[in-house]
């Protein structure tokens, strides 16, 4: 019998309103079962800051100009995700998948920027992670 893994996936889309979390069990090839789907709304401060930064980014240069604010928001977003993981992930979760929060997406320029510190999330939650 193939080993079954339990994984927690975190997704925060361009709406910037919160985090969708799903726990699945899978052998990684043929078997899959959904254990849980849950939504976690960002607090007003995080929501406001995501949209303030997104509204002020029109070019790659804007990302550089806002680097201090972006780093501060990235830490807050990572801490929020860590609380989500801690509230859901018991000892049997093998992996955590972490997308981060999209703040800039320009397909024509082939640039996309997501906020989230995978290393910090792993340290805070004591879980293996993949960014």
Where is each model-derived feature located?
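Short acidic/glycine-rich loops and adjacent helix/strand connectors
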Residues: 1-131
